A protein has these predicted regions:
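Active-site core segments that coordinate phosphate-bearing ligands/cofactors
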Residues: 1-2, 17, 110-125, 133-168, ...
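N-terminal glycine/serine-rich phosphate-binding loop of ATP-dependent small-molecule kinases
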Residues: 1-93, 148, 223-224, 228, ...
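Carbohydrate-associated surface elements
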Residues: 99
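Active-site metal-coordination/substrate-binding segment of hydrolases
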Residues: 105
Length: 501
């Protein structure tokens, strides 16, 4: 079983040993109404309750004895934070990774000269949605909550805690959340001092060194709630970034993974620390790093667009008995890209490229069609992925193939746009839930079902034919990408002014 708790939705999937999904269940990951600028929160206990219902539903749908489920793996959105008291109860809303209330803390670290010191230890680029800045923000603004904190977890770790009653995380997840000294691959009092939260060092969970490590087993109480068999092994798992890579089998040389889900994730692996990367987190092999460039600006823009501006497509979809996304794909596909004038900056969910960036449409006039606006959103998302992938390429990490995962990977239209914008073959996998598959594979290895990752990939990961490139579009996209970058550069002054109120 793989559990993938995302920013938008949470999924539970049961796979057979050959990667076939035999049962699934899902629930929206409900966001609270914003209590303040930059707040992106959720009810920790309620989301666990919803996921536990999904676990039970998946077990029942699978029509197999619970004892036949060899193991459970868990992943979730990385970063953000879950606060527990000393008794293990959630004492405040959890924070999603898009939460940026702690921008002021980042600015404070930069003024104090702390920012670069932290980045040097964690081997990444600290941003406001990481646990350290959020915890410091609570210390400065909600001391009554901060003083009760007895445990710090990522949400995937909270799910494991509710399943096993074991307070643990894994090296990849907490390394990616910048809570680990990447020089020692362990916790660091110096790092906690730099964050300004030294008193929380003892609130850090047990650190499993491998995603495949069995950290505990399903308790009697969790068994009664979820329908899983008591004693079922639960693996340490990994952050969703790595889980999607594993689920896509993208461990080969010069193979990138692009996750076009709520976040814009772009990653590969090497034996090098890449300066100024979003993160260089612990990878599957010692001595190698997961080199990442990412931002909270991908499929979340499309989700917003369909909710706020997708009414026309929704009505047509109802008339034709199609999905709203199928109608939008048709609209996008009919747009002649050489005539497109509209641009979209895809920063609805979180700032990217610039700390104060917001989403914008540019160049709309009376001749602009609804289809062109739809197209500009898809292209804008592809452009932000290009921005990050180019960073990794320019750092000396070559790419010959990109495995595209996430919600937008289900669309052949989006696959084609990505391939032509990036000028790299896009290869999909025959699994719509690669994050869940990635941690299911880890659990399978931990439980002894697979010998190792290579054995699991050979048996469980099915790769599709690559999307063919249309090189006639390359000059058009190169020109439009250059203009898109220029527009964002021009907007920086305005964004900064607006951020001051």
């Amino acid at each position: 079983m793989g559990i993938d708790a995302g920013n938008t939705s949470s999924k539970v999937v049961i796979f057979d040993l050959y990667g076939k999904m035999i049962a699934t269940a899902a629930t929206p990951s409900m966001h609270f109404k914003r209590r303040g600028e930059g707040f992106e929160e959720f009810d920790v206990t309620e989301l666990w309750n919803l996921i536990s219902v999904c676990i039970k539903e998946a077990v029942e749908k699978a029509a197999v004895a619970p004892e036949q489920i060899a193991g459970v793996g868990v992943t979730s959105f990385g970063n953000g934070v879950v606060f527990l008291d000393k008794e293990g109860y959630a004492i405040a809303p959890g924070c999603f990774s898009q939460d940026y209330r702690a921008n002021s803390i980042i600015e404070m670290y930069q003024r104090e000269g702390t920012y670069e010191k932290i980045n040097d230890i964690v081997k990444g680029t600290l941003f406001a949605g990481e646990p350290g800045p959020i915890l410091r923000w609570y210390k400065e603004n909600y001391r009554e909550i901060y003083d009760q904190i007895g445990g710090i977890l990522q949400f995937k770790d909270y799910i494991m805690y509710r399943l096993t009653n074991v307070f643990a995380t894994d090296l990849n997840c907490f390394g990616g959340a910048f809570m680990v000294d990447m020089n020692t691959m362990d916790y660091s009092r110096e790092l906690m001092d730099l964050y300004g939260i030294p008193e929380l060092y003892d609130a850090l969970p047990k650190l499993a060194t491998e995603p495949t490590e069995i950290v505990g087993t399903v308790t009697k109480e969790a068994s009664e709630i979820t329908g899983l068999a008591e004693g079922t092994p639960v693996a340490a798992g990994m952050m969703d970034i790595l889980a999607c890579l594993v689920g896509a089998g993208a461990t080969g040389e010069e193979v990138y993974t692009a996750v076009a889900g709520s976040w814009c994730i772009n990653e590969t692996h090497s034996d090098r620390i890449i300066p100024n990367a979003s993160s260089n987190m612990p990878y599957l092999k010692k001595g190698e790093y997961l080199n990442c460039s990412y931002t909270g600006a991908s499929g979340s823009n499309y989700e917003w667009f369909t909710r706020i501006l997708g009414g026309t497509a929704k009505l047509e979809a109802q008339d034709r008995n199609l999905s709203q996304y199928a109608v939008l794909d048709e609209l996008i596909e009919m747009v002649p890209i050489e005539k497109v004038k509209v641009f979209f900056s895809p920063f609805v969910a979180q700032p990217s490229i610039h700390m104060n960036a917001k989403a914008n449409f540019f160049n709309i006039d009376m001749s602009t069609s609804y289809a062109e606006i739809c197209y500009s959103v898809a292209e804008g998302v592809a452009f932000i992925h290009k921005h990050h992938i180019d960073f990794l390429r320019n750092a000396g990490l070559p790419v010959k193939e990109i495995r595209l995962t996430g919600g937008t990977a289900k669309s052949h239209v989006w696959n084609q746009i990505f391939a032509n914008v990036l000028q790299v073959p896009i290869v999909g996998v025959d699994c719509e839930e690669t994050g869940a598959q990635g941690v299911a594979i880890a659990a399978g290895i931990g439980a002894g079902v697979y010998k190792d990752y290579e054995d699991a990939f050979e048996k469980a990961v099915k790769v599709k034919e690559p999307v063919l490139l249309d090189d006639s579009t390359f000059p058009i996209y190169e020109k439009r990408y250059k203009e898109w970058c220029q527009l964002n550069e021009i907007m920086k002054t305005y964004w900064d002014e607006k951020s001051k109120g």
